[in-house]
Amino acid sequence: MSQQTERLERLLTDELGECCDADVEARLASLRAHRSELPAHPESDLTALSTLGSETRYTIVRLLNATDREMCVCEINPIVDVSNSAISHALSDLFDAGLVTRRKEGNWRYYDVSDRAEALLMALDDTQGDA
């Protein structure tokens, strides 16, 4: 038996009072059945979560969500105390991750929070303090 299986057997013994190979196999089969519930390609999720891991990008998404309207870099700059270049770079990363939308009108580019970002922020807000 592998070390993982031995540890699982110890867990089952604690839970059930006793454990045999059939108990271990049944638990392993049950656990393996959940594999299909995992995303086949988690890259999009991981990109979105890691992109929000920057304070600048997180603040921009929160700001766009709070204002509930499109904003230009020059409007974001007074609130997010970094250079216009850093804001533009952060917005580009957020767009690539699917967390903001953008549109160009004349010389101006406007950004707004995406539905996905709103859902992530809502999940964070709904679970704040649960840790």
What residues fall within each predicted segment?
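Beta-hairpin "wing" of winged helix-turn-helix
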Residues: 96-105, 112
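N-terminal helix-turn-helix DNA-binding core of bacterial DNA-binding proteins
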Residues: 40-82, 110-111
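Short, hydrophobic-biased segments on the C-terminal half of alpha helices
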Residues: 91-92
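N-terminal leader segment of winged-helix/HTH proteins
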Residues: 1-52
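Conserved segment of winged-helix/HTH DNA-binding domains
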Residues: 113-131
